[in-house]
């Protein structure tokens, strides 16, 4: 499924749109990959009603709530440069109000060497990050990435692991953003692919062999498309593509502008007509 920048931003602004199905599908799986205990229904309830259902830790509640805000921020800023400041903003937003924030571990690059849990991959050291991240961002210009470029960026970003925590979620947010901006079918990692995702990512990072990782991402694209089709979302997106209509608010503004110009023209014509009649109605000296 491909959705353009303008289309996605329009969906976000519209009530009862496909956005309300795509957002929880992405977040539910991305968060579960990091241990969240929220079900998709519970996440939707939190997103739409602001109510928490189920038994969850305070940090899980806050991070899940924050992930909804981060998703919205990513959509709002589509088309803007992926800068270091943008990455840091995502990390700060994701952990706002959590114990990680209180301990001072968020809103900046990592200060202590870290690792990927359950992996033998040796990630970058804190001293590497100030140079490595700018190089990574420069190597993959915004809006011009192929499927392979996006996958390669993800492999490299996760290998750098620039933050003390939250790298997986931020990496998947970036992958989603890149897909939209570059016209690539959306990649949503399903939590049911947790083990192969981590295994093939590790293989790509340690050996440079990315074939299996590419295959997995293609499978995730196909699986996501099938889910959206079952929910009726594909039909909505196809109609959006076909219509090519401008957002109604934009069109309404244009119509109002046209009406204002027409009204001004009518007033001007009426004034000229009045002035013309006045000239003809003025009595001659002999008639006075």
Sequence positions of predicted segments:
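FIC/Doc superfamily catalytic core
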Residues: 1-165, 169-288
